[in-house]
């Protein structure tokens, strides 16, 4: 079987040296992706296309599907390459190939020709089109918007019968641009922004700020691995996980409620910039869209950018949510994003939309930056190829209850401000306060003869924290959902 790879049009308008470099990189990317399907596969580059030849017919659909997801490819032609003698021979081969497909349909013939011949492309179109129209009674010629377009390519003494055309994702081949680090949360925005930079030719590494224990990290790892495996598996990339719970805890204790969102984003950018510098990455990528949330106003985005010299790319800055969700659906990350948790403990009640630099800096003076340095230093860096095995590990489920027994105590894990604003009172059971960001260090000090029912407003943080505690060996935890 044979496939003809057509280049993304922006590649074809580059200078000769740049075009050749892009084609060489794309050829290497195709080999890296397809070698898993057929090790004997041949990839041959030409000036205006790339040929892929494979012997294992059983892998035809898998190879075709993989090619449609490699950045830099405009479309793929699945072809049958046969010799021919003259124009009538071309017609006979076209009739054998397309007869069933054209029955009862309108059609036209389009021919591309390379080499020296006694006929022109238009003459072949007329001869083959007339012959098909004469020999297939139910078919008729229609030159504009036909049901079927018969594509033929003539090159020297070879005829390419095009059996199918399949659209690629376009863009530039990965590796033609420099590396970037995507701040991935597993939601709609970060997944789509990561894809957009891969499509533009960047090798995308991933940085995840863990606010909810191992379960959340497993979910985000699955998203990152999916994106890499589907669109970027030609290159090795890193997945860096930073335990940001200590940083969030420090912010919740030391920073004014209205400034928390901007300060948290500034801390994330500081941490990600350190990671990017460590690995020689040139830019950060975020999924921020202008005005989508309080921290994404122009004033706040500028303050967030000010904490680092690292370039921050925001490919979704002018997109609305509906457009982003549609893109997530197209690339296959919608289902991941819909089930990814949001954290009730990290949201300000009255976030500022126009933060003042002096006030933000004054709030940050109370912050212990050694905590930030420590979490970056202890960041977990893994090769994304290892994630497939790691994400298969089973996560222990935690029981959810709506009632309580005589040995049960409700543990309110919301932030202190949330608890002060809306105290939890449940008749017939004790309620103890312990903010979620202190659970990892303080839960062991509680009475372990009791069964602790974790509770938060949305029920997501409580479940994840209960799973985290179970992983630490605490079996006396459940989730309370009245």
UniProtKB/Swiss-Prot annotation:
ATP binds at residues 183-184, 265, 287, 296. It comes from the Bacteria. Residues 61-165 form the THUMP domain. It is an enzyme of class 2 (transferase). It is found in: Cytoplasm. Its main location: cytoplasm. Its EC number is 2.8.1.4. This is tRNA sulfurtransferase. It comes from Salmonella paratyphi C (strain RKS4594). The gene is thiI.
